[in-house]
């Protein structure tokens, strides 16, 4: 995947959510893609993916952001099939379902702290997820698992770090890869 500059990506302040709670993320944040814009790709999610993006926010992103207490940038959320292929995503990517987000949380220490916080929240029964993946520098070897490449890069912070998290309602295995 291509590394993108996330400095221009919007970071949402809290807004009133759909379920009466607070939502820190918007659907436009989760579907925005500089690559799609540049390449003229329509990255609008179908209705089923739109619904799953709301589930992702409600079940994972908002609780994580609330516990974190600071802004978290979504560097990659929903990807249509064409965009996913263009950026080098795996063929069975949860991003194409609207079930995944790649997160950026500052420097390496912040990333490590956020990754550990997400694990702690899962261990305490506060959240469940499908996969939590520690992403390394562009082109750096990552932990290999079924469906993941061992040489993969994604939209990341200036130091090449990202955290992938997914929520597939029928597959909450809480798989942790890396760190």
Q: Which sequence ranges carry the predicted segments?
A:
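Acidic, His- and aromatic-enriched active-site or binding-groove loops in soluble protein domains
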Residues: 91-113
